[in-house]
Amino acid sequence: MKEHIIALVDCDSFFVSCEQAVEPSLRGQPVCVVTGDNGCVVSRSREAKKAGVKMGMPMFMARREFPSVIYKNARHELYCRYSRRVMTCLREIVPDVEEVSVDEAYADLTSLDRVYRTDYTSLAARIRETIRRTADIPVSIGLGPSKLLAKLPSDKAKNTGGIFRIFPDSIENVLRETDIDDVSGIGRSHSKLMAYNGVFT
């Protein structure tokens, strides 16, 4: 039976990555993108995360607690331009792409292992390299037999070399270890209801 496999391609700290693409000196620095002087933090570099800056932190609080961090006002036209570059790169390799946000897309890789004569993990690596080289944006890729099971490992991919795959024989274990709050599509109210009924994973 044909193996069905979906990739979730997720741009890393997308707004910050766009700022670093146009201003390379920002790479390796603690950088945050904020929604204006009276707004809040909407994107953080890895260094800013390590420093302790939280997503959604009000600008006045972030500047007070983390004065050494570089703060950039959001530039949505810039991010849309880079989003188009990323999606164009992805579509040059994978015909079936579903954009779900400015920095995220599902790609159906089913049977493309035979087209490119490689395994799916290597194909994901090729996608990452192409996007990084052409669009100058780093991405992480989760691989799984469905959209849900591609979404779950995409966060793990950020800490495991950029790619993480869930294989069919590990699905049960992965779901058992996944908190309900981490499952895409289950909102806070449903999560509370399930917890009330003793369902946590």
Can you name each region flagged by the protein language model?
Residues M1-T201:
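Gly/Gly-Pro- and Ser/Thr-rich, intrinsically disordered tail segments characteristic of DNA damage-repair
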